């Protein structure tokens, strides 16, 4: 009886060759296709997998779970890798790998496989998730397998093999970039972009218009949150209202994209140590992250906010590096959910030519006291108390300066 392997399958050249290669090695290959919002023909992908040799194909729509359990969860900690990247690819991988493990368990498969390369982050994200959720599963990673590497030294070898085995391949001109698309973002890498000094042509971008070509009129959105989670968005100009999580996020993508929001060009540090340039388009999440952070300004205690902000870079790093299912992630999420208990209210954002600008906010749990903050009203605050406050905080500075002068003599 053949041993079963569940392959994370995209329908592209790499995973199609891997599927056939696994079949020829004697495996019963079950292809698993995850719909996380990429614009693919899933019926065609399923047909291609079956023709290539898969005994069964799972095509699953994970978009809603991606939004509610992954994107919105990352929002709780304002996850942003190296202060800039909103982690669109990294957030999707644990969801895909989790479902792959569940299918393997359902099918009684002994193996799981993926087509991630040996230089990138995705190999780590997939395999750490496998290990965390089912340590008994064996992993087949062809791009780290000596036999596979000896047979396929590059794209030409893959194409020749596909043609030899009758695997359908696209003959149309391919975009000269490596791209990953899901509901949260689209990323562009490789090709000319590997030169960090190269200024990308406008044709790199496929989701967003250039801010220069965006409408000359602002869009005002009112975004509502409950305990840090988005629950409603209202367009204050045309009255459009969305409350369903998936529809809400798709609408923010639509509004952000046509207003040139969410473009990012950066060089980042991959987990394995290689620096990589990525060009990203993340319109909807950029709007959400900005609005959410603004609401925290009036609802979160100062020290809680600052402590959370100290932990946020670690949170983003864990997501980026593939530790979504880990004890430290459970710890951080428990803390973040506690910190978000009063992050309830609404924020109005002005969206204009690539910018997302909060212009108003309200919360029933607001810690903002107009009288205390007023420049005109004393409001129960005794200004003379500040003298002692400053003296106490100045004490160590005075001592430090006296000692410093003493050392200089």
From Swiss-Prot:
Principal location listed in the UniProt entry: cytoplasm
Alphabetical list of Gene3D superfamilies matching this protein: Argininosuccinate synthetase, chain A, domain 2 (3.90.1260.10), HUPs (3.40.50.620), Single helix bin (1.20.5.470)
Pathway stated in the Swiss-Prot or TrEMBL entry: Amino-acid biosynthesis; L-arginine biosynthesis; L-arginine from L-ornithine and carbamoyl phosphate: step 2/3
Enzyme Commission no: 6.3.4.5
Assembly information from the UniProt record: Homotetramer.
Molecular function terms from GO: argininosuccinate synthase activity; ATP binding
GO cellular component: cytoplasm
Cited SUPFAM superfamilies: Adenine nucleotide alpha hydrolases-like, Argininosuccinate synthetase, C-terminal domain
Subcellular location, record wording: Cytoplasm
Positions with a binding annotation for L-aspartate: 117, 121-122
Organism: Thermotoga sp. (strain RQ2)
Keyword Acyltransferase: no
Enzyme's top EC category: ligase
Stated name of the protein: Argininosuccinate synthase
Binding site for ATP: 8-16, 34, 115
Catalytic activities: L-citrulline + L-aspartate + ATP = 2-(N(omega)-L-arginino)succinate + AMP + diphosphate + H(+)
